[in-house]
């Protein structure tokens, strides 16, 4: 097994476990795998070669060693590591398969949708002032954006940090995770009991053997019994620590699930009105009583003064108000007074513009008088009647 494969495996286990599970994984790697591989091999490498009995009977020494150690300590611990880690590895394989299947299904759905547009309604923001297309624009308009851009915005938003439990629940892996946790705990308890019945808590310096083919009771001696006893107690402690971590993780999952359910119920009680209003797909519109402003026809540019342009704009605005406004019978008194003042101001503005045009265009008035004079020559009866009355006519 290469280190790169082990590194990838550990990264995946970290991504799909709680923080207590990550602590358990650290204990498994550091105190079990490394300690067994480094310390166990160096301590127990001469376990059988240094097992010496005070007899010359052929085969007696091998029989006594088999009675002393039915299973080697190192092989027992290696077998324990493999069986305890098997549920986690199986859970990891199932989790990777399920998540990959979910991602493949989501990718197919996105490809089938072919990036549909998400629509939302937004305020107009005074775009009418810059457009000159002679068209009526609504006060509300749909804003288009790509579905992918919307998803990227959602992903960029900061998500609340959690300990991995919520991610396991969101991926639908909670039952499998609890099942592998229970299996791991059962294996820990089984190996802890088996280690006690096989080796006890101490490695004795000698062993009395009376099995056949030994002719009588003989004494066999073990190398470095104190060192092996200390290492045996360390492995007991590591097994107990892993068992406590498993129990802690089960309690963490149970209390965390209960806390999440209580928090969700509390949020529902605090915000009961979130589900009282039915959702409709009606097109949004302006508030009641709000009139859509229609653009007037574009005024052709002439050489009129600014006063004449302002007059025409005011006249168009008044026409729009009369067209889309309420009836005069339903208007309040203040609004009627305001309209009368607007009409009076309009009349004054008309007189001012006429006087301004008469003052600035005297040549045009003389041409008009000449044309009227030619008309008067053709119609002598009307001219003589006006001259006979002695009245002068003023042409504006």
UniProtKB/Swiss-Prot annotation:
GO BP terms: namely: cardiac muscle tissue development; cell development; cell-cell signaling; chemical synaptic transmission; gap junction assembly; vasculogenesis; visual perception
Cysteine pairings via disulfide bonds = none
Location of region: Disordered? 146-165, 356-396
Give residue ranges on the Cytoplasmic side: 1-22, 96-175, 249-396
Annotated membrane-spanning segments are: 23-45, 76-95, 176-198, 229-248
- One Gene Ontology cellular component annotation held by this UniProt entry: connexin complex
Task: Kindly state which keywords UniProt assigns to this record, in alphabetical order.
Answer: Cell junction, Cell membrane, Gap junction, Membrane, Transmembrane, Transmembrane helix
Q: Which residue stretches are annotated as topological domain Extracellular?
A: 46-75, 199-228
InterPro entries, A to Z: Connexin (IPR000500), Connexin45 (IPR002265), Connexin_CCC (IPR019570), Connexin_CS (IPR017990), Connexin_N (IPR013092), Connexin_N_sf (IPR038359)
Source domain of life = Eukaryota
Q: Where is the composition biased (Low complexity)?
A: 373-396
In which residue ranges is the amino acid composition biased (Basic and acidic residues)?
Answer: 147-156
Main localization of the protein?
membrane
Subcellular locations according to the entry: Cell membrane; Cell junction, Gap junction
Q: Which GO terms describe its molecular function?
A: gap junction channel activity; gap junction channel activity involved in AV node cell-bundle of His cell electrical coupling; monoatomic ion channel activity
Q: Which Pfam families match?
A: Connexin
Instruction: Specify the protein's topology with respect to the membrane.
Output: Multi-pass membrane protein
- Summarize the subunit comment: A connexon is composed of a hexamer of connexins. Interacts with CNST.
Protein family per UniProt: Belongs to the connexin family. Gamma-type subfamily.
Reported function: One gap junction consists of a cluster of closely packed pairs of transmembrane channels, the connexons, through which materials of low MW diffuse from one cell to a neighboring cell.
Name this protein carries in UniProt:
Gap junction gamma-1 protein
């Amino acid at each position: 097994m290469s280190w790169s494969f082990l590194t990838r495996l550990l990264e995946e286990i970290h991504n799909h476990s709680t923080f207590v599970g990550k602590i358990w994984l650290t204990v498994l790697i550091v105190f079990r795998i490394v300690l067994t591989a480094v310390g166990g091999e160096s301590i127990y490498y001469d376990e059988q070669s240094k097992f010496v009995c005070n007899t010359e009977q052929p085969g007696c020494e091998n029989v006594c060693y088999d009675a002393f150690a039915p299973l080697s300590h190192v092989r027992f611990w290696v077998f324990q590591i493999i069986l305890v880690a098997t549920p986690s590895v199986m859970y990891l394989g199932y989790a990777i398969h399920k998540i990959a299947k979910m991602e493949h299904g989501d990718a197919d759905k996105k490809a089938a949708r072919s990036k549909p547009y998400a629509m939302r309604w937004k305020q107009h923001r005074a775009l009418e002032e810059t457009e000159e297309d002679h068209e009526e624009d609504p006060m509300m308009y749909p804003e288009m954006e790509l579905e992918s851009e919307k998803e990227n915005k959602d992903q960029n938003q900061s998500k609340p940090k959690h300990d991995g439990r919520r991610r396991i629940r969101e991926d639908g892996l909670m039952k499998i995770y609890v099942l592998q946790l229970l299996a791991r705990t059962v294996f820990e308890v089984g190996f802890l009991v088996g280690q006690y019945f096989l080796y006890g808590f101490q490695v004795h310096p000698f062993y009395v053997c009376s099995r056949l083919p030994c002719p009588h009771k003989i004494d066999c001696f073990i190398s470095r019994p104190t060192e092996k006893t200390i290492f045996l107690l360390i492995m007991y402690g590591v097994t107990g620590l892993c068992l406590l971590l498993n129990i802690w993780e089960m309690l963490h999952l149970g209390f965390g699930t209960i806390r999440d359910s209580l928090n969700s119920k509390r949020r529902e009680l605090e915000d009961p009105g979130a589900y009282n209003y039915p959702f409709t797909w009606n097109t949004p519109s302006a508030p009641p009583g709000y009139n859509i402003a229609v653009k007037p026809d574009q005024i052709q540019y002439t050489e009129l003064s600014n006063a004449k342009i302002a007059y025409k704009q005011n006249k168009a605005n008044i026409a729009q108000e009369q067209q889309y406004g309420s009836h005069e019978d339903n208007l309040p008194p203040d609004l009627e007074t305001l309209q009368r003042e607007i009409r009076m101001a309009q009349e004054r503005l008309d007189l001012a513009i006429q006087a301004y045009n008469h003052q600035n265009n005297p040549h045009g008035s003389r041409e008009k008088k000449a044309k009227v004079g030619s008309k008067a020559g053709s119609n002598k009866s009307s001219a003589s009647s006006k001259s006979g009355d002695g009245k002068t006519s003023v042409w504006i």
